[in-house]
Regions:
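Short, conserved beta-strand element in jelly-roll/cupin
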Residues: 41-43, 52-68
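Short, surface-exposed secondary-structure edge patches
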Residues: 39, 58, 73-75
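Ligand-binding loop in jelly-roll beta-barrel domains
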Residues: 87-111
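Conserved short histidine dyad/triad with adjacent acidic residue
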Residues: 36-53, 87
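Short acidic-glycine-tyrosine-enriched beta hairpin
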Residues: 72-88
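A short, N-terminal "cap"/entry segment at the start of jelly-roll beta-barrel domains
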Residues: 1-34, 38
Length: 111
């Protein structure tokens, strides 16, 4: 058996084009077999508006700190912590007086 090593596209940072997203840049790292992995870079006072997703999402905070909400609950999220967003539940991610770098892992729901 040989090791399967292949290139992947190197994508530059670009602003998230979604309406309601301000001060957030992203770059996709992987999009294959229903799995989507991206980095998000939040400026101070940046936000991704509240929205649901049909997929399950894990948000890992790599640097900095911010806030997340899931449904009616809100919590801080800091470097070294992760948030889990179940499918079809409105969620939001934002910063106030700090920047934040996250790794987002989105996969189809097991439901």
């Amino acid at each position: 058996m040989s090791v399967d090593v292949r290139p992947f596209p190197r994508v530059d940072w670009s602003p998230i084009p979604a309406e309601g997203a301000t001060g957030v840049d992203s770059r996709a790292l992987l999009h294959a077999d229903g799995l989507f992995v991206a980095q998000l870079r939040f400026a101070e006072h940046a936000t991704i508006h509240e929205h649901p997703s049909a997929n399950e999402i894990v948000a890992l905070c790599l640097e900095g700190e911010g806030f997340t909400s899931v449904g009616d609950e809100t919590a801080p999220i800091r470097a070294g912590e992760q948030a889990h967003w179940p499918p079809n539940v409105p969620h939001r991610l934002w910063t106030e007086g700090s920047t934040m770098l996250t790794l987002m892992i989105e996969r189809p729901s097991a439901e």
